[in-house]
From Swiss-Prot:
Family matches, as SUPFAM superfamilies: Actin-like ATPase domain
InterPro entries linked to this entry: ATPase_NBD (IPR043129), Type_III_PanK (IPR004619)
One Pfam family cited in the UniProt record for this chain: Pan_kinase
Name assigned to this protein: Type III pantothenate kinase
Species of the source: Xylella fastidiosa (strain 9a5c)
């Protein structure tokens, strides 16, 4: 039986098989709320070992774990540690560093100096030097969360829609231009500072469900949609040999 990798985020739930270190095709599963969809959970794959990375609410994580423990002989939950597989985290308290960010760094190690950007509910930015040293990062709201926050405080502002323009002439266009533009500007600023700090070339790696709307404005970028799962596979290999 195969092992399986599960990436449970704040808004997306993905899985992929893992066989002899090779990740299979990625499946996007129905996202689960705290009320849970029992049928969707029962449709989760079965296998030998399940490796779970979760940044979801505790109630959702608990429900998913309960089902995985039925479907698998063993369940292991990924957690951030100070050093793993060549990567050393900058945080003085590594447990405060999100496991999704941690795994994305594991997945990108070995590709030189990289600025790793995750676009989901939050926008996360982390600088990883070629020697595996994490040099810190930033957390901001993603464009989607910015739109949601604005709509929550002013219902007349739409949640979606609009086209990116540098100087928009209607509200929908102004919203997408402002929110996406803020994210692009933060990424560009971080990339500039990364070059200044390292005095070397730095690759820009993007992952996460909200990446598509930013890609056209970021120039030379590598899109790595499976980066967290790639890192989880590395973490699984380390865990299996402990």
């Amino acid at each position: 039986m195969n092992d399986w990798l599960f990436d449970l985020g704040n808004s997306r739930f993905k899985c992929a098989s893992l066989r002899e270190g090779v990740i299979g095709p990625v499946t996007v599963l129905p996202y689960l709320t705290e009320t849970m969809d029992a049928f969707a959970l029962q449709e989760l794959p079965r296998g030998r070992v399940a490796y779970l990375a979760s940044v979801a609410a505790p109630a959702i994580t608990t429900h998913v774990l309960e089902v995985l423990k039925i479907h698998f002989e063993q369940v292991q939950v990924a957690a951030t540690v100070a050093a793993c597989a060549g990567v050393r985290i900058a945080y003085a308290h590594p447990e405060r560093f999100g496991v999704d960010r941690f795994l994305a760094l594991l997945g990108s190690y070995g590709e030189g100096n990289v600025l790793v950007v995750g676009v989901g509910t939050a926008l996360t930015i982390d600088l990883l030097a070629a020697n595996g040293c994490h040099l810190g990062g930033r957390i901001s709201a993603s464009p989607t969360l910015m739109r949601q926050a604005l709509h929550a405080r002013a219902e007349q502002l739409p949640l979606s829609g609009g086209n990116y323009l540098e100087f928009a002439e209607d509200t929908e266009d102004a919203l997408v231009s402002g929110c996406n533009g803020a994210a692009v500007a933060l990424i560009e600023r971080s990339l500039y500072e990364a070059h200044q700090r390292l005095d070397q070339s730095v690759r820009l790696l993007l992952h996460g469900g909200g990446v598509a709307s930013l890609l056209p404005w970021l120039g030379d970028v590598v899109h790595r949609p499976t980066l967290v799962l790639d890192g989880l596979a590395i973490w699984a290999a380390v865990a299996a040999n402990v």
